[in-house]
């Protein structure tokens, strides 16, 4: 089963897929002129609540338009909890970072915030949850 989740922004491709009991949420982002990006999980204009336990997060810089070295990534719940617990700071622009054993229960829409990435750079973030 696959559920496509898309926001109204043309700068994001956000979708979920289901593999057995594991689900995958993917954000493909492009930063604005200030090097920032922010997007909440939405479906047809409504907040899309993630229900489950986050197990793994991958932060992947684009190969052709990579972000500035040392950019920051935060994934937060509606109550402001940083799912990455601050580990999304100072990301390398030439390597995928994978965070295992997150084990954070979530019952909230999630917001991806990228900062310090440089003008119109790209990347993606994958969140695996059960």
Question: What positions do the PLM features span?
Answer:
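Surface-exposed, low-hydrophobicity beta-strand/loop segments enriched in small/polar/acidic residues
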Residues: 2-130
């Amino acid at each position: 089963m696959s559920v496509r989740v898309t926001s109204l922004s043309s700068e994001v491709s956000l979708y979920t897929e289901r593999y057995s009991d594991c689900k995958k949420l993917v954000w493909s982002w492009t930063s604005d002129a200030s090097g920032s990006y922010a997007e909440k999980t939405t479906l047809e204009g409504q907040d899309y609540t993630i229900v489950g336990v986050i197990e793994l997060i991958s932060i992947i810089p684009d190969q052709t338009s990579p972000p500035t070295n040392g950019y920051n990534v935060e994934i937060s719940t509606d109550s402001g909890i940083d799912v990455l617990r601050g580990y999304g700071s100072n990301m390398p622009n030439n390597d995928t970072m994978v965070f295992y054993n997150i084990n954070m229960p979530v019952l909230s829409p999630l917001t991806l915030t990228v900062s310090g990435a440089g003008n119109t750079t790209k990347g993606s973030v994958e969140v695996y949850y059960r």
